[in-house]
From Swiss-Prot:
ATP binds at residues 15-22. Pathway: Pyrimidine metabolism; CTP biosynthesis via salvage pathway; CTP from cytidine: step 1/3; Pyrimidine metabolism; UMP biosynthesis via salvage pathway; UMP from uridine: step 1/1. This is Uridine kinase. Signal peptide: none annotated. CDD domains: UMPK. It catalyses: uridine + ATP = UMP + ADP + H(+); cytidine + ATP = CMP + ADP + H(+). Keywords: ATP-binding, Cytoplasm, Kinase, Nucleotide-binding, Transferase. It comes from the Bacteria. It comes from Erwinia tasmaniensis (strain DSM 17950 / CFBP 7177 / CIP 109463 / NCPPB 4357 / Et1/99). One of its GO terms (biological process) is UMP salvage.
Length: 213
């Protein structure tokens, strides 16, 4: 049964792939959690809402443009945000970067006072923007993002450097220019220099802490 008295604050963090979104989200989560406890703050990665592709062959899956809004199941994400705001728990999807589809597993996420939502395409969807109490765009130069992405995808996601570069040239950069960068206009706060901008993190942390006063 929904808890109508439950108030859930949604903080959106968007920006290019490997811009430092996840670092900012994890830093805010860790430092705010120390003060308010794990039961009051959580993180939802937009990546968890890539569409299920289990009906496709592996050859077809790798051809998907993962930087286009159509690759995301934003309708399910919207439903889950609305459920959390209504005081209902959700089953967060688990996506496999190796298999390029959702797994059969889910993660149970109980309602929290604050949910940090992070992903590249969050601000491109007006429905998601409507659910956010405030939003952040992490503004990092593309050449830095590319270097970070290559290191991450090769070391953590089993990719080759050639495949990472090919994907960057074919879809990542064009989709950033077409969809992600223009969505910066919808952000309440623009954070330069990525996840190591300590001053910006302290300001954001103070803003989030206001919701617990």
């Amino acid at each position: 049964m929904a808890d109508k008295s439950h108030q859930c604050v949604i903080v959106g963090i968007a920006g290019a792939s490997a811009s430092g979104k996840s670092l900012i989200a994890s830093t805010l989560y860790r430092e705010v959690r120390e003060r308010v406890g794990d039961e009051n703050i959580g993180v939802i990665p937009e990546d968890a809402y890539y569409k299920d592709q289990s009906h496709l062959t592996m050859e077809e899956r790798v051809k998907t443009n993962y930087d286009h809004p159509s690759a995301m199941d934003h309708s399910l994400l919207l439903q889950h945000l609305q459920m959390l705001k209504a005081g209902q728990a959700i089953d967060l999807p688990v996506y496999s970067y190796v298999e390029h589809t959702r797994t059969q597993k889910t993660i149970r996420l109980e309602p929290k006072k604050v949910i940090i939502l992070e992903g590249i395409l969050l601000l491109t969807d007006a429905r998601l923007r409507q659910e956010m109490n405030f939003s952040i765009f992490v503004d990092t130069p593309l050449d830095i993002c590319l270097m970070r992405r290559m290191k991450r995808d090769v070391n953590e996601r089993g990719r080759s450097m050639d495949s990472v570069m090919a994907q960057y040239q074919k879809t990542v950069r064009p989709m950033f220019l077409q969809f992600i960068e223009p969505s910066k206009q919808y952000a309440d706060i623009i954070v330069p220099r990525g996840g190591k901008n300590r001053i910006a993190i302290d300001i954001l942390k103070a803003k989030i802490n206001q919701f617990f006063e």
